[in-house]
Amino acid sequence: MEPGVSIESGSAIRVAVLPVGGPISPARLRDYAALVARHARVDLASLRPYYSEHQKSPFAHQPWGGGCLRLKFVLGGCVPSPWEDFQSSRKVLAVVGICHLPSSPDLGRVAADFVDAARSYPSALASRCFAFCPTDAQLVQKKRDNIIMFPPSDQQSLELHMLTMIQDLSASLLMEFEKWVLRAESTGTILKTPLDSQSSLGSEEVIKAKKRRLGRAQKIIGDYCLLAGSPADANAHYATAIELARLTGDVFWHAGALEGSVCALVVDRMAESDPVLEDEVKFRYYTIIQLYRRATLQDNAQRVSPVSFELEAALKLARYLCRRQCAKEVSDLLMGAADGAKALIDASDRLILYIEIARLFGTLGYKRKAAFFSRQVAQLYLQQDNAYAAMSAMQVLTTTTTAYHVQSRKTSKMDHGLLKSVVSLFESQWSTLQMVVLREILMSSIRAADPLSSWSAAARLLRSFYPLITPAGQSGLASSLSNSADKLPSGTRCADPCLPFIRLHSFPLHPSQREIVKRNPNKKEWWTGGGPSGPFIYTPFTKGGTSGTSKQEVNWIVGEPVQVMVELANPCSFDLIVESIYLSVHSGNFDAFPVSVNLPPNTSKLVLLSGIPTQVGQVSIPGCIVHCFGVITEHLFKEVDCLLLGAAQGLVLSDPFRCCGSSKFKSVNFPSISVVPPLPLLVANVVGGDGSILLYEGEIRDVLITLTNAGTVPVEEANVALSGKNQDSVISIAHSTWKSALPIKPGGEVTFAVTLRAWHLSPTDLEADGSRSPANSRRIAREGSNPFLDIHYAGPSGNSESNDVSLPPGRRLVVPLNICVVQGMRLVRARLLSMELPARFTDAHLRSVSSKDNLSNGSDAIRNDISLLKIDPYKGSWDLRLLELELFNPTDVVFDVDVSVHLDGTSVEQKILPEDKTASSACHKTRIDRDYSARVLIPLEHFKLPVLDTSFFVKENGSDEPLGSRAATLAEKNAKAELNASINNLISKIKVKWHSGRNSSGELNIKDAIQTALQASIMDILLPDPLTFSFRHAKDGTTAKTDSSKEPGDGSSRSADESVLRCKDPIFANEMTHMEVQIRNNTKETIRMNLSISCKDVAGENCFDENSATVLWAGVLSDIYLEVQPLQEVVHPFSIYFLVPGDYSLQAASVIIDATDVLRARAKAESPDEPILCRGSPFHIHVVGTA
């Protein structure tokens, strides 16, 4: 069998092209051969100048106008075929020698070599030797026969010269064909095939051979007519041969003649596309196949079988019909030919058959069938034990890799912008077959001594099918990779990656890369309005943007290092040593830094790959360059993304990252990376350390911040602003300091101060700590609660003369002020106390307290201080309410606590009553050591409202009230607002401040605690009594003068102030003492009442008892009817006479007649008939005896 056969093959003249003379390089030989083969078709009309008709031509229907000769050049020649007499197209009818004269200076030797080479082809009818590039000396030598020199010239001249010589050769062949045909017609010829020479012929076979000789001669004459370009003459001879072969029963030659007639028919109508012609060709060729099959059955006893001609006929018809419309018919023909391969004795015939079947299936588009028969070809090549056969097997197997989707990357240029279908790239059901193909490529490449191909095959096998390979097999492939790499030069690159698997993990941008701000040339304050509210401008791996198609943008700066995080996985059972890995950048404006990585078996690792942008422009990073197993390969991120997507859909064998314990596949969008010109780079440093700034609540401190320009461009402009939470904790920023330092040159720095004040912690921060352990409760710092310094800065604006209005971008530096607010003093609890027992204070105590702060104010100041104390050393604190605050110091420092109450715009410091009552005198400050507590008492008597109003008792739910006057409703609302304002005023007047060390001070937030403590008793504290009683001592019947600075309506203040009897005004026994009781109406309505005055001794006995009276009196002391106008006072005088010295107390009480609802609500009466009794505080009197 012969390769590349077709129906038209019978019309091609076989010409052997042989190199002769000295050695010729393969490249030069290919160039010379291509120059010859370019003229494979020679028109008959062009042969007229070289053709001479010696006698009448046997080709009566020669188409000189449109016919042509077809030449088939065979480089290197071919072995003579035993079937040359059966098909003349198998003969080598011409020999062309190619000589490179610079390597063959002796023309005689060249001529001799050519004669010797041409002698190997006795069937050759013409010969020429083309000698190229002769020297001047060779050109002047005597010309030799059949040696044609081609002087050096341009390509066009060489082609024209060659065309002339090929035309001359073709004309010689045509004249030789005429001679051969004329001789064969006159004298006949003896034609033999291997079928005729197998055994000695008997008498019957001799007679049969003589009958068949004429028909065979007509068939051969038809072949020569076809070779001479006269299909009409050939068809006439073929028709005669067909009839004679049919009559003589020469089945084999009958099939040959019929096949020649089809060739003549097709060649004659080459330019036509006729369905009738196609049907005729198919009908005749099916007949030819049947005839060859009959001839095979007749000659099955012969050692040489003509089955190859049957298979060739099937291949010729399949090639003629090879198109999509006839796919089924062509496939049936090819599969039938494949079945007949078993009958072929010669292995080379089977090889050619499988090659042709694979080619035709590939032309038809049946890639898988073509790959299957290509593998059969490779198997036949591998049966031969030589390197050339192994190379052929490797090349054939390489053609099948596309069909099995295991092709090398170098054979398929991938488009990095478009992802191929996962289904077409990965088909797990082919895994076993794909492994077999790659293993065959690996074996053939090793036998062919091609280390790069063997490395590529082993890499694809290990990378794609590691889950199906045993650990021993994986180690064997690793050894094969290392052995192949040892035979390759250092730095060899391969298009097919091996291990590890690499996927893009993230872009961990440095803050200097995140904070890039575009500058608007039309806006002076370019930093306003364009930035986000938080400290981060760009977060690469979050779902951002309202448009799903918008691509994220990342700006890199020339000369500043950047990082890309990738994840490496080694799913195999051996240690993987990656000699170097770095980013693959195709844009050429990036310098990548290599790193080495060691991956243990079945592990993955995150690796940071870095580099420096070198030029302005776009940066493209499709993957990584890896130097592993001695070869450099490129690993593309998108290939691994396709692999992981296929694993997620179950289309590929395994996910290498999940096998190594990595997280689930997460697709990472590759951002658009732009490189901008060099920018300044400010680095902030908080003097004293970058940790948290520890501040107690309310503490004020200056923090120094240093800015250093670490870039290569000066800072021309800058702006410092505040962002984040608790911005009011920044009191001031020294703007003038850093502004005066502009411009900040590269390497320069500036230091400025920021004044901070710690804020008060929220209730959520002050959760109760049952253990009270300082380690558990002292440090409270919440993320996101700190303020930030937003520093926008930029370098020079560039060339002002340039027409480009765009400015280099600016930068944003975020300096977090990590303030850790610590609770300096803890308010454990607050509660309201009612003091109903006398609080005894010595006279010296009162004098020491009053003189400590107000020594220069005289006696009036002393009286004011005593009144503010709200405690009578003699009569106690009958109606006094004390607010107790329990404080705890959980820190490791000492605190001094001050309590102050602000009255009428002045701050009056309150004295602290420590829990230890043994103190001899009160102190302004209370010192609380570590892990100690103290209690602070705050009197609340001076906070009562001046008037008891009806509106204070209006129900909050007004739905029950009828629609009344809008003015009344407004008054009620105003009264409620006044009550709420009074409550808030009461709370705001109490201040608890602390001091610690030299500069640390603050204020304790007690508002909520006080409000909770006063929740139940706020009405009793704020609202005054309906009636206020006070006693006066009158000398000689006249009332003692009081402090004229008192307000007339401030009854509570007057009673409190004047109820204290001074030691300088003693009362003596056995003397008449004149007294007055003052009653004040604190309501807006007239009150009628019955007043009674009682006197008791220290035993609580009534001193006015008629039976055992110890005190005598003058005046009315019981059932005294009085009527007091709204907000007015009445005075009732009386006199008393003490018989026995001692301590006595006077007390006034009144029963209100016809009490109103307001009075009943204030008294919290349970029934409307219940009497309303108002009682005043006891008035203590100390009576001394007479000397």
UniProtKB/Swiss-Prot annotation:
The keyword Transport applies. Its main location: Golgi. GO terms for cellular component: early endosome; trans-Golgi network. The keyword Cell wall biogenesis/degradation does not apply. Residues 1037-1059 are annotated as: Disordered. GO terms for biological process: cell plate assembly. Specific subunit of the TRAPP II complex, a highly conserved vesicle tethering complex that is required for the proper transport of proteins in post-Golgi trafficking pathways to the growing cell plate in mitotic active cells. Part of the multisubunit TRAPP (transport protein particle) II complex composed of BET3, BET5, TRS20, TRS23, TRS31, TRS33, TRS65, TRS85, TRS120 and TRS130. This is Trafficking protein particle complex II-specific subunit 120 homolog.
